[in-house]
Amino acid sequence: MHIQSRFAHITTPKGTVLVSHGYGEHSGRFTALTDALVEAGYDVFYYDHYGHGTAEGPRATVDVGRLIRDHVNARRIVRAHARTTDIFLFGHSMGGLITAASMLLDPTHLRGTVLTGPAFRPLPDIPASTVRKLLPLARLMPSLPATSTSIRDGESVLSRDPEVQKAFDADPLTWKGGTPLLTGATMILQGDEVLRRADQTTTPLLIFHGSADKLTDLKGSRTFVSNAIAAHPDADIHLRVVDGAYHEVLNEPEGPGIIRDIISWFKQH
């Protein structure tokens, strides 16, 4: 795991943010966010998940449980090198699931967490009970395609802006094939586990989710927030539904405003 960083050009940063990218992509797709964070006075750390981007491993084929453990370890490394004790987490899609799971495993040393389109319930929605029966096969044949279609098939699924999908398709570091069985199965099971443990959430949390997301189910975010607030009615936990937005809310027309909202939320915490 190769963790990279960008430091704000001030002696004392306002905070430190660890950014976690989604399935099939890489950390370089979050330049707009990291640029804005650095400009606002935040130090930013990021890395490519195993099997993604420039990281080692078979392409997009990984047990998501490993990625969660990697994230917990990355947080320890970030704390050791951070110029401030104010640590924030950001995660998108699968990275949102990983970030939430990491937060639940170790809620210490965190000022707050922001997620966009977290993969608590990846689409199409397959019951966890069914997936558990497939797990032995997934470990035996991890690269077996779980889906017959790629993210490129048909209309844009990432953003209402077709240029976002075109850029993804042209990017040599993104994965365009179907979801490998091991990745898909463990993502669903980890999402189910995170939703089951949502009532343990006490860390300040803000989730953005597009109402027209075709890759991760908005119901997953609603369930997480509902369960967390039911257990802790006074908790600082909120869901903002972005009307009409697809999966990558930061790459929608509302994206610049959402980035400003994220920075404002970090400042408040």
Task: Tell where the protein language model's regions lie, with residue ranges.
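Short alpha-helix in the alpha/beta-hydrolase fold that links the catalytic acid
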Residues: T203, D217-N227
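Conserved alpha/beta-hydrolase
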Residues: T34-P58
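Active-site glycine-rich loops that stabilize anionic/oxyanionic intermediates
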Residues: G22-E25, S211
